[in-house]
A protein has these predicted regions:
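Conserved micro-motifs of the catalytic ATP-binding
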Residues: 1-4
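A residue-level detector for a conserved hydrophobic packing site
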Residues: 9-10
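Short helix-loop "hinge" at the ATP-lid/N-box region of the Bergerat-fold HATPase_c
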Residues: 20-21
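Short beta-strand/loop element within the Bergerat-fold HATPase_c
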Residues: 27-39
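Short conserved segment of the HATPase_c
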Residues: 52-66
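Short alpha-helical Gxxx[C/S/T] motif in the catalytic ATP-binding
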Residues: 76, 81, 85
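Conserved glycine-rich
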Residues: 93-95
Length: 117
C-alpha cells in the first residue's frame, strides 16, 4: 500500500488519462499499470501514438506548454494538466516522468510504499 492524498493522486491519474485519450494514435490503445518496486509503487499510463519530440520532453511540465498546438485546438486542451501533475508530485516529494516508446508514450509517477507495522 501507499500513503498519499487520495484526491491529489486521483488528479494525477485523471490528467494522465485525459492526455492519453486525446493523444492516442495508431491502434488507439491505452493501458494503466501499477508496478511494485523496492521502495515505491510506480503507476503508469501508456498510449499508442507518436512519441514526444526529445526537445519538448522537459518543457511539457510547464504551465500552458503544448507540443502539438493544432491537435490541442481540436479538443480544447489548456496545457496545464501536466504542470498540475508536476506540482502535485513535487508537493508529495515524489517523482514523475515520461518515457517515449517506439509505438507510444508512457507517463508515470511514483508513490512511496507504506511501512508495515
Amino acid at each position: 500500500y501507499v500513503w498519499a492524498d487520495e484526491f491529489m493522486t486521483e488528479e494525477v491519474v485523471t490528467n494522465y488519462l485525459s492526455n492519453a485519450i486525446h493523444y492516442a494514435g495508431g491502434k488507439k490503445e491505452i493501458s494503466i499499470r501499477c508496478r511494485e518496486q523496492e521502495k515505491n509503487v510506480r503507476i503508469s499510463v501508456f498510449n499508442t501514438g507518436d512519441p514526444i519530440p526529445e526537445e519538448d520532453i522537459d518543457k511539457i511540465w510547464f504551465k500552458f506548454y503544448k507540443v502539438d498546438k493544432a491537435r490541442t485546438r481540436e479538443y480544447g486542451g489548456s496545457g496545464i494538466g501536466l504542470s498540475i501533475v508536476k506540482a502535485i508530485m513535487d508537493s508529495f516529494h515524489q517523482r514523475c516522468g515520461v518515457i517515449n516508446h517506439e509505438d507510444g508514450v508512457e507517463f508515470w509517477f511514483e508513490l512511496e510504499k507504506g511501512k508495515q507495522s
